[in-house]
A protein has these predicted regions:
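Acidic, metal/ion-coordinating pockets
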Residues: 1-142
Length: 142
């Protein structure tokens, strides 16, 4: 296991997580055990599982997942997340408002996003991040 201390300027340390569901009253507690390690990565990638919105109505053919508050995404910045997909099976559970609010919040935190969008072209646009002169692109489909 890496201690996260990647000082080599020609190598990038990449961390990728699974589904991120940040619906707890204290979203920082969710990340506390991994904050130090994740924040040491050059590229930290996650999959946002539920909409983060205060708008929209539950709209799903699946069992809908309740939306989480947009501010619950704030810890992702502290953890170093810089690339995320939003194309999970619950992406549309709160309709277009849920998608737009989630995208806008992630982008306001400096996180590049792919997988959903205001239109299909935006959804298909790769998320790109650059660190140490290394560019990483991410696409997300479901």
């Amino acid at each position: 296991m890496s201690d996260g201390s990647n000082k080599d300027p020609q190598r990038a340390l990449v961390f990728a997580t699974g589904d991120i569901i940040v619906d707890e009253p204290d979203p920082y507690s969710f990340f506390e055990p991994s904050l130090e390690l994740l924040s040491s990565g050059d590229f930290v990638i996650g999959q946002i599982e539920v909409p983060h919105t205060d708008r929209g109505e539950a709209n799903s053919t699946d069992i809908p997942a309740p939306p989480a508050a947009p501010e619950n995404l704030n810890p992702l910045k502290d953890c170093g997340f810089n690339l995320c997909t939003t194309c999970g099976n619950h992406a549309h559970d709160n309709g277009v408002p849920g998608i737009v609010d989630t995208l806008d919040k992630l982008r306001s935190l400096g996180i590049a996003v792919t997988g959903t969008g205001r239109n299909i072209q935006e959804a298909k646009t790769p998320a790109i991040a650059e660190r140490k002169g290394i560019r990483v692109g991410l696409i997300g489909y479901n």
